[in-house]
Amino acid sequence: MKIAYVFLASGAVASIAATSEHRSSPFTAVSSPPPSCSSHPAPTENIAAQLAKFRPVRMPFSTAGLSAKEVSMVRKLVEAGQDLESIFWRQSDPEGLALYKALANCPRPAEQQIRHYLLINGSRYDLLEGNKPFLAGAVYEPGHALYPAGITRKEIEDYVAAHPAKKAEIYNPWTVVKRSGKDLVGVPYHVEYKAFLVPAAKALRDAAALSDDKAFANFLRLRADALLTDDYYKSDLAWVDLDNPKFDVIFAPYETYLDDLLGVKTSYGVAVMIRNPSESAKLATYKKYVSDIQDALPLAAADKPSNAGHPTPMEVMDAPYRSGDLRHGYQAVADNLPNDPRIHAEKGTKKLFFKNFMDARVNYVVLPIGKLLMRQDQANLASMAGYLSVVVMHEISHGLGPAYARVAGKQADIRESIGPIYSGLEEAKADIVGLYGLDWLMNKGVLPKTRARDYYASHVAGIFRTVRFGVAEAHARAEMMEFNYFVEQSAITRDADGRYAIDFAKFPGAVASLAHQLLDIEATGSRTRAEAWFQKYGTMPAELQAALAKTGSVPVDVDPITSFGENVR
């Protein structure tokens, strides 16, 4: 869930200075002793080559313009974030964490390369290549360490059908599912991860005591309470209500990217952010028309939620520290949170744009790959400004569309109804509804129609970046489907020389028809239809795979280097 030249100065990047088969509790030993420097598992792929796909980029913490008290507050927020990083590893791959720690003082470069690739992925599984194990002996299971080893979705569904009173416990986004004899139980996160949540909550309260912003301090105290109860509702309301804060944090288990078993379990993520006020102010144009775009969506009126919460906060921030699911694998350049549909109905959502991460991605990845794969005149249309606009509307669009599904005449949670494919469906909906919203803004004269080619070219260049190393990750699955649909509609064609071109006359119609399909799938909560749609459109075409094979000189993503270190325990 995820901006630039309109907001960013030229050359901004320079200023950036740059589950295994055995799933243990985080508080019990793994099945075998931690490996030593001489006995670690052998790589199953060329780790040096994998690391070379990432561009290291420094994301420093600049204290310029901050008081000593503010610097201390930021450091307390980071301290709390490091506790949540320790939890994330235990959700993702406890045995991978044991190996990461065991290799800390190993002297050989090969061992440090393994350790660094473990850090990039937060596990022994390549998050950008379909969770493919990259070390011998690692066996991936859906749902990582959030479920018992060997369990299947069918087993869970059959158990819940036989024990309906257990459904809320098993499907709760904030429980770890475990076996208890022949039964399944859901252990609350605040119980399972208490050893890390208690110090994290204390650090948040310490940060609150250092804040001169009373509303932000109040939010931090509420969020500290939420960590110890798994009830984030009150603190989420306070978070969305923050008015142009100088500092902000993402600090919760929000996203379900680790859970490809049921698609409901959340993992912890953290971003410590410092606001860029001048860039944030430029988002006003988009904020003004959010409810109008919602009204204009190709969706039945009954499926459109109340607009009472719109428009909602949008902020451009630098993020000098991230951890958990915001640190590993796909490096988000923006976010749209919280995910609670109750908050959507009452307040909407907060859209956050990570300026330093956006700069790095566009300069180092998106524009270079577009120049290799797109027809040259169209590749030159892709820009920081275009990509920014596409990402802004993507994040706005996560909060648009149905808030609930209609299932058997009743309201149902969309995420639960759709199942594991939900993450990909929702990312695609945000992409396509975002483009639909840009078309609406241009048709209403809010944005100049001359920008259309810029927007479309920037989005297509972004598709190539997202899918080039596989289509298992949610964003890649979404954009692979979009690409194939656009090709089917002749909105994207392939020239005789193998370069791709956009048919600018057909593209808006293809966007509108795809928006209708995706919104309707969410509104009806049809898992069968969602899975069939991605089955039809989700495969990488051979000719695109061959074209992407020529992009080896372009990084797959950035590898952020912060001023704070990892400090995982």
Regions found by a protein language model. Name each.
Residues 91, 207-211, 525:
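Secondary-structure edge/capping motif, primarily at the C-terminal ends of alpha-helices
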Residues 27, 32-125, 130:
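N-terminal mature-domain "stem" immediately C-terminal to a signal peptide or N-terminal signal-anchor/transmembrane
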Residues 79-90, 115-123, 176-179, 202-206, ...:
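Short, hydrophobic/amphipathic alpha-helical patches that form generic packing surfaces
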Residues 47-59, 64-74, 83, 163, ...:
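Fold-level signature of zinc-dependent metallopeptidase catalytic domains
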Residues 435-531, 536:
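Long, well-structured alpha-helical subdomains associated
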Residues 100-189, 503:
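Amphipathic heptad-repeat coiled-coil/leucine-zipper-like oligomerization helices
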Residues 1-21:
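Sec-dependent N-terminal signal peptides
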Residues 515, 519-569:
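Extended, compositionally biased alpha-helical segments that mediate assembly or anchoring
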